[in-house]
Amino acid sequence: MALGASAVQMGSIFVPTEECDASVEFKKVYLNAHREDIRIIQSPVGMPGRAFDGEFIRNVAEGKEKPRSCPFHCIKTCDYTKSPYCIIKALYNAARGNMKKGYAFAGGNAYLSDRIRSVKEVIEKLKADFFLSKALL
């Protein structure tokens, strides 16, 4: 905040927690990731997003995940005939642990988690890091 920020996004740090209801397989993507595993992808409506690279993302790049129909109609601007994949199916599959048919969005530091923690542990670490950084300023 001292550098002029008015807010931060910190969702990724809470994914590999005991309280997160995502599957263990989904959480393992965060725990096993390296910095180079995170890349910018394009959503079916052309919006960029940061995600972990994986089999599904590579299949999308090769044109292997094109939808044949659209049972959901979740995004008005999404044209399934031009879309490289169905985002709702990909995110649903990933949340359920089927990472071969889905992917996980990620923050820039999402690869830093090394184990599943409780939210309480995450908050305590954030507080400790904050006070340490404040002392160094």
Name the predicted role of every residue range.
Residues 1-137:
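Conserved active-site-proximal phosphate/metal-binding subdomains
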